[in-house]
Amino acid sequence: MHSFSTLPNHRIGLYILWTIPVLFVIFKLLAPAKCSLPIVNGRRWFEIGQYQARRRFSLDGRGIILKGLQKARAFRVVSQKGPKIILGPEYANEVKSHPACNADVFIAKEFHAHVSGFEVLRPQHVMKDAIRLKLTRSIGALMRPISDETTLILETQWGNSNCWHELDLKSTIAALVSRVSAVMFVGEELGRDQKWLSIVTNYSSDMFVADLDLCKWPEILRPIATYFLSSCGKLRRHIQEAALMLDPILSEGNSTHGNKQNFLDWFEEIAGGRKYNPVLAQISLAAAAIDTTSDLIIQTLTDICRFPDSEKLQEELREEMVRVLRADGWEKSAMYNLKLLDSVLKETQRVKPVVVFGMGRYVTEQITLHDGTVIPKGETINVVNTRVWDSAVYENPLEWDPYRFLRRRDSGDHAAHLVSPTPDHMGFGLGKHSCPGRFFAATKIKILLCHILLKYDVKISDEASSKVVSSGNFLFPDATLRISVRRRQENLSIWD
């Protein structure tokens, strides 16, 4: 038997010629099926790589998506994070319950949950169960503590002056939301600690930067690249610092003070022996609670102040708040009966949602959708939330109408409630993976806005910019906006 090195050159050449097509066939058989959907913002003929296509998406993601929907109902885009499949809203009900469309795997892959610093994004089933089984059922008991904490924060940060004074809207609302949330999640001592608040607040914003930095690297190199990127190093430091602060409380074996319970207790109870990381769970919980809640409050206050008849709207909201709170107090029924406020919030979430597309799913097996559209195994898909701007669904869709959902609710439309997601309004997602904490979030937002509007007059300068900032898939309120406030003389009996 000849060794390969002793074979004649012509026979070596024949082996190579036969090997290449065999390997090609093997690779073709093992490789994922190629997606045939059109790509709407690919690289131009003179461009090398996808850098410019990604940059264009970063600058005008919403515009690219809307143009894509004019050409096809299912297509691909080159996003800041690479190629994605985008589906029209008519696929929402199909995707939400399809067994081959996995939300947990999508989140893990989309946000590098296997990479150091991003462990917070790993599926947190204990957290989801605690929200569903404990938090949602405890909303009534938490309303008074939320109100009391809001009072303390506003007195310190907004003051009691009856003269107009300006506040940075983004930072003051983020501080309010983060502290109220933290006190409910980890108790008063840690929840009021500025270092803890800084950690849980900054992790989310720093993760956004680190995520985009990491996406510039090939996926196979990201577990290594994370150790060379300063933005990823920040995430690891946040986690380490959070552990140093939380571990002493956890080591006591009892986080409960008096008869008050918080998520530290609920996690242990719900875990029931299941393995979980309480530090990662707390950071994940805070990130979910702070960003979207702050976003909605900031944009709602902006919309109220920008409304042509702002003073009249503010008085109508205050009249409703006083009437309802006098009748119901801080009970769950009060939140249900704040119908105008609910309409205002849902309308703000409609006109400026947090994202253009959501419902991210990883396709575990090739699927064929109702119209014959084939999605290969291994692809990630997203469903657009663009019906919120569709004139076939909403009259004058680009106009902010604070009474829109109040009219719909009065006509018997049960989907007009803030916490009721539909394919026409997916602000909280859709289906079994819709935001599990939306009931708590809606309650917290309403309580905070009751305090703000009843205790303060608010306005925004006519000269101030309040444009929505688009960055890829995300829509952000204007981060530079300042709000003017002054203390009002409200009926204090409603806070008793």
UniProtKB/Swiss-Prot annotation:
Membrane-related topology note: Single-pass membrane protein
Q: Does the keyword Nucleus apply?
A: no
Record bears the keyword Acetylation: no
As for subcellular location, the record says: Membrane
InterPro entries recorded:
Cyt_P450, Cyt_P450_CS, Cyt_P450_E_grp-IV, Cyt_P450_sf
Name the residues that span the membrane. 12-32
Identify the CDD domains for this entry: CYP503A1-like
Q: Which cofactor does it need?
A: heme
Q: What is its EC number?
A: 1.-.-.-
The further comment given in this record reads: In A.calidoustus, the austinoid gene cluster lies on a contiguous DNA region, while clusters from E.nidulans and P.brasilianum are split in their respective genomes. Genetic rearrangements provoked variability among the clusters and E.nidulans produces the least number of austionoid derivatives with the end products austinol and dehydroaustinol, while P.brasilianum can produce until acetoxydehydroaustin, and A.calidoustus produces the highest number of identified derivatives.
For this entry, the protein name equals Cytochrome P450 monooxygenase ausR
Tell me the gene name: ausR
